[in-house]
């Protein structure tokens, strides 16, 4: 059976992206992301895929599925699909991670079973936001962390 999980780092004001990238560089959070998603399928939008540094594309040790409306788009080492439903059909059983961006998160929120949220204790400027997620979810794990000037919590929510 498939379990759909969203994994995201989000500022207090909902921001998750700025000008095609992340508004922060958090090495420990990137390691958490890699450790959590390794060995699983990851689903992302084309812009998210293209925002990943080229040397890390496709994300290693994971099946990469990219959702795009551009039927001619191609990238080596990834499965390309036209919509989120098609992506879910390709996933098979096990936990699949939706990793962004904003449009894909909004579409996947209603089918998600679990959220892995890095809640950053700051408000930042940005142009991509994560959909509201407090209602309908219960917190099952919280681990506080500090990295330089950044304070954040790794939080896991399950649908209530």
Model-identified regions with their sequence ranges:
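Extreme N-terminal starter segment of soluble prokaryotic enzymes
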Residues: 1-6
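Flexible, gly/pro- and Lys/Arg-enriched active-site loops
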Residues: 8-41, 46-160
């Amino acid at each position: 059976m498939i379990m759909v999980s969203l994994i995201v780092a989000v500022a207090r004001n909902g921001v998750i992206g700025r000008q095609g990238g992340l508004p922060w560089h958090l090495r420990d959070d990137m390691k958490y992301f890699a450790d959590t998603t390794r060995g699983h399928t990851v689903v992302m939008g084309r812009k998210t895929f293209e925002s990943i540094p080229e040397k890390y594309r496709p994300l290693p040790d994971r099946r990469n599925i990219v959702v795009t409306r551009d039927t001619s788009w191609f990238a080596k080492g990834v499965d390309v699909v036209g919509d989120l439903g098609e992506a879910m059909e390709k996933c098979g059983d096990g936990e699949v991670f939706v990793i962004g961006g904003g449009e894909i998160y909004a579409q996947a929120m209603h089918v998600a079973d679990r959220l892995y949220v890095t809640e950053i204790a700051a408000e930042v400027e940005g142009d991509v936001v994560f959909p509201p997620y407090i209602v309908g979810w219960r917190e099952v794990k919280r681990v506080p962390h500090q990295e330089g000037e950044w304070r954040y919590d790794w939080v896991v929510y399950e649908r209530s």
